[in-house]
């Protein structure tokens, strides 16, 4: 099973990716992990990427696609792989198609923006232990206070509503078009096109996992 998981920040992709990878015995591949591994291993592409990153630049799609092609030939990808956060843009998707990277399926986890804002902006964290709460879905016994230590909880900057809105805007402008790209490609009936499936990402984790696995069956 070779698949891409798409969905807005906070849609629950990370949680579902873990279940899917366990179920199919495939690795979860993120560009960040790939870059770090290639730099550490000192591969030609890794050294090229390091040069760009050290100068504060963005690693080009050519380098990323090269890393992807190297990564998916490794033994742990024999049964497939799950791309996490890649491709992010239409040019990356085009480059992947041109490079002949084969995909079986694109799965979109669809969650309305309002639900994502509620989900993310309600998170509260106890910094020292990493314990997380949610003001609505998993509240502490006493509002704003850690159950175990009685110490105050914080809202991370990443979870503040303004930040969440900004991340959603970036998603809508850059990554959301990929959903249409893969849906349109699948609709052409091209044999090389991955299937496109969309599931609702609201409800309990178990309900969403059941939907995800049914979509992949």
From Swiss-Prot:
MF terms in GO: adenylate kinase activity; ATP binding
UniProt subcellular location: Cytoplasm
Residues at which AMP binds: 31, 36, 57-59, 85-88, 92, 156, 167
Pathway(s) of this molecule: Purine metabolism; AMP biosynthesis via salvage pathway; AMP from ADP: step 1/1
Disulfide bond entries: none
EC number annotated for this UniProt entry: 2.7.4.3
CDD domains (UniProt xref): ADK
Uppermost EC category: transferase
Biological processes annotated in GO: AMP salvage
Keywords: ATP-binding, Cytoplasm, Kinase, Nucleotide biosynthesis, Nucleotide-binding, Transferase
Reaction equation(s) it catalyzes: AMP + ATP = 2 ADP
Domain of life, source organism: Bacteria
Binding site for ATP: 10-15, 123, 132-133, 203
Span list, region NMP: 30-59
SUPFAM superfamilies: P-loop containing nucleoside triphosphate hydrolases (SSF52540)
Protein family: Belongs to the adenylate kinase family.
Record function comment: Catalyzes the reversible transfer of the terminal phosphate group between ATP and AMP. Plays an important role in cellular energy homeostasis and in adenine nucleotide metabolism.
Subunit comment: Monomer.
Protein name as annotated: Adenylate kinase
Organism: Methylibium petroleiphilum (strain ATCC BAA-1232 / LMG 22953 / PM1)
């Amino acid at each position: 099973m070779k698949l891409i998981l798409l969905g807005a920040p906070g849609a629950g992709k990370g949680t579902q990716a873990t279940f899917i990878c366990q179920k199919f015995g495939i690795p979860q591949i993120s560009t960040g992990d790939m870059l770090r591994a290639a730099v550490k291993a000192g591969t030609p592409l890794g050294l090229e990427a390091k040069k760009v990153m050290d100068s504060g630049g963005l690693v080009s799609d050519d380098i990323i696609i090269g890393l992807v092609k190297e990564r998916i030939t490794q033994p742990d990808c024999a049964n497939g792989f799950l791309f996490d956060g890649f491709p992010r843009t239409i040019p990356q998707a085009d480059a992947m198609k041109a490079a002949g990277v084969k995909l079986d399926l694109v799965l979109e986890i669809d969650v309305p923006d309002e639900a994502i804002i509620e989900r993310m902006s309600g998170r509260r964290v106890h910094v020292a232990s990493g314990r997380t709460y949610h003001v609505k879905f998993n509240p502490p016994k006493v509002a704003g206070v850690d159950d175990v230590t009685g110490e105050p909880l914080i809202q991370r900057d990443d979870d503040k509503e303004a930040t969440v809105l900004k991340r959603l805007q970036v998603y809508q402008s850059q990554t959301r078009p990929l959903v249409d790209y893969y849906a349109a490609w699948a609709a052409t009936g091209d044999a090389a096109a991955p299937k496109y499936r969309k599931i609702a990402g609201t409800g309990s984790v178990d309900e969403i996992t059941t939907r995800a696995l049914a979509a992949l069956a």
